[in-house]
Amino acid sequence: MQYVRLYSDENGDSRFAEAALALDEIDYRPPAPAVFVSHAFKSDFLQFIRLPGGWTCEPINPPERQFLIFLDGHLEVTASDGEKRSLGPGDRVLMEDVHGKGHRSHVRGAHDCLAAIVPIA
């Protein structure tokens, strides 16, 4: 499964990278046919976040490593190295830039952006 990784490099700059998560075929719930499943991530909770249309924030760092799974709307994220990504429904991002210069975010257009946040250990 492909996802985007946002991390801090050794100089504290936030950077994007393409990443992949292996999915192994297992008999998850017999007698249903086998499915493809990733390894388990430890998480204490799941949150949903709605960012209003036009919402903008200056450089921030996430409070902890977390997956953002975009459900609706579009968020433009700018890493501190200047690279921009437009993220929308179905996109998955592992936010790991918890230290350093952080990243900027902006909801594109008037439509709200809805995402699920899953903090991971």
How would you label these PLM feature ranges?
Residues 1-8:
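Short acidic, Pro/Gly- and aromatic-enriched capping/linker segments at domain boundaries
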Residues 10-59, 113-121:
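A short glycine-rich, His/Asp/Glu-containing loop-to-beta-strand
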Residues 21, 80-97:
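Short acidic-glycine-tyrosine-enriched beta hairpin
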Residues 25-27, 101-107:
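Short, Lys/Arg- and Gly-enriched loop/turn segments at beta-strand edges
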Residues 55-57, 76, 92-93, 99-104:
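Histidine-centered metal-chelating micro-motifs
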Residues 59-61, 107-108:
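Exposed beta-sheet edge/beta-hairpin loop segments within beta-rich domains
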Residues 60-61, 67-88:
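A short beta-strand-loop-beta hairpin characteristic of the jelly-roll/cupin
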Residues 92-98, 108-121:
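A short hydrophobic beta-strand segment most commonly corresponding to one strand
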